[in-house]
């Protein structure tokens, strides 16, 4: 079995203009990603500010992306919530719109135990019958999909991947022991650890920074797959990532997507934009990165 994708999937931002979703800016951004070698597009996830999008907005965004991508790369819809039934409903809608797969975050706030996690994920997957990417991000949910639980879930024919945002290589190694990596993909959820994640056998990354440097980030994966040492190639990307860490995702990345004119620099409360000085420093870091490419 082939993996859902290999290399860089982009955790897509949502462009706003005057607090409304700007679908034209969204189309321009998606075209930019497709032209620059993105291998998958993830819609309505954390980076998209999904908690502050209405159901109607999520559906319009997803339909716009699916229609534009037109099967050139997989479109993965974030449909997971901390309510199993609502997650099923959202997943059915994503399937009806033509999503290639869904991404399911662990329940948050009303967090469960590992047995509950299995039942939650299996209930959604059994109902919808679309490929599923599990999303493990304990820093946001205070809930971890333990390696033993990943092993159980990986045996389901529709559960095909894990987005691993633990930034914990011991966790990665323990998961790897328990799954068949020929049929179950491991994607990093942390842009800054991809060099080691790839070296340890990861199949790719679901990336924030690839919103603005998709070609360069995919080239890193391709070089590693060719057997090259990518430490030096990563260094300028690492410098840009350090600048991007000035605040919580997606606050900084939207300072850059707006710089590329994919919507205004707007976020929905409770998120707020960077201070002007931080925005200037971040955009200068991006300019420095791009200038270095052209030397």
Swiss-Prot record:
GO terms for molecular function: 4-hydroxy-tetrahydrodipicolinate synthase activity. It catalyses: L-aspartate 4-semialdehyde + pyruvate = (2S,4S)-4-hydroxy-2,3,4,5-tetrahydrodipicolinate + H2O + H(+). Pfam families: DHDPS. InterPro entries: Aldolase_TIM (IPR013785), DapA (IPR005263), DapA-like (IPR002220), Schiff_base-form_aldolases_AS (IPR020625). SUPFAM superfamilies: Aldolase. CDD domains: DHDPS. The keyword Transmembrane does not apply. The active site is at residues 135, 163. It is found in: Cytoplasm. It comes from the Bacteria. One of its GO terms (biological process) is lysine biosynthetic process via diaminopimelate. Pyruvate binds at residues 47, 206. The keyword Nucleus does not apply. NCBIfam families: dapA. Catalyzes the condensation of (S)-aspartate-beta-semialdehyde [(S)-ASA] and pyruvate to 4-hydroxy-tetrahydrodipicolinate (HTPA). Belongs to the DapA family. Homodimer. HAMAP family: DapA (MF_00418). This is 4-hydroxy-tetrahydrodipicolinate synthase.
């Amino acid at each position: 079995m082939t993996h859902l994708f290999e290399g860089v999937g982009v955790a897509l931002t949502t462009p706003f203009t005057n607090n409304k979703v700007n679908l034209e800016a969204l189309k321009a951004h998606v075209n930019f990603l497709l032209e620059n070698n993105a291998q998958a597009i993830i819609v309505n996830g954390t980076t998209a500010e999904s908690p502050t999008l209405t159901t109607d907005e999520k559906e319009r965004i997803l339909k716009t992306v699916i229609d534009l991508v037109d099967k050139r790369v997989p479109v993965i819809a974030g449909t997971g919530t901390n309510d199993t039934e609502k997650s099923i409903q959202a997943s059915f809608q994503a399937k009806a719109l033509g999503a290639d797969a869904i991404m399911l975050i662990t329940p948050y706030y009303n967090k469960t135990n590992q047995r509950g996690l299995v039942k939650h994920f299996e209930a959604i997957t059994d109902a919808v019958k679309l490929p599923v990417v599990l999303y493990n991000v304990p820093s946001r949910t205070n809930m971890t999909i333990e390696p033993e639980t990943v092993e159980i879930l990986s045996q389901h024919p529709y559960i095909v991947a894990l987005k691993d945002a633990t930034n914990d290589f011991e966790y990665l190694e323990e998961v790897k022991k328990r799954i068949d990596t020929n049929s179950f993909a491991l994607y990093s959820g942390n842009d800054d650890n991809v060099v080691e994640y790839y070296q340890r056998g990861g199949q790719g990354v679901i990336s924030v920074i690839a919103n603005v440097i998709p070609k360069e980030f995919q080239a890193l994966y391709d070089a590693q797959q060719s057997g090259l040492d990518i430490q030096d190639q990563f260094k300028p990307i690492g410098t840009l990532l350090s600048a991007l860490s000035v605040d919580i995702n997606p606050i900084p990345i939207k300072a850059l997507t707006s710089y590329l004119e994919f919507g205004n620099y707007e976020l929905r409360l409770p998120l707020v934009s960077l201070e002007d000085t931080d925005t200037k420093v971040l955009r200068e870091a991006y300019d420095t990165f791009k200038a270095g490419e052209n030397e």
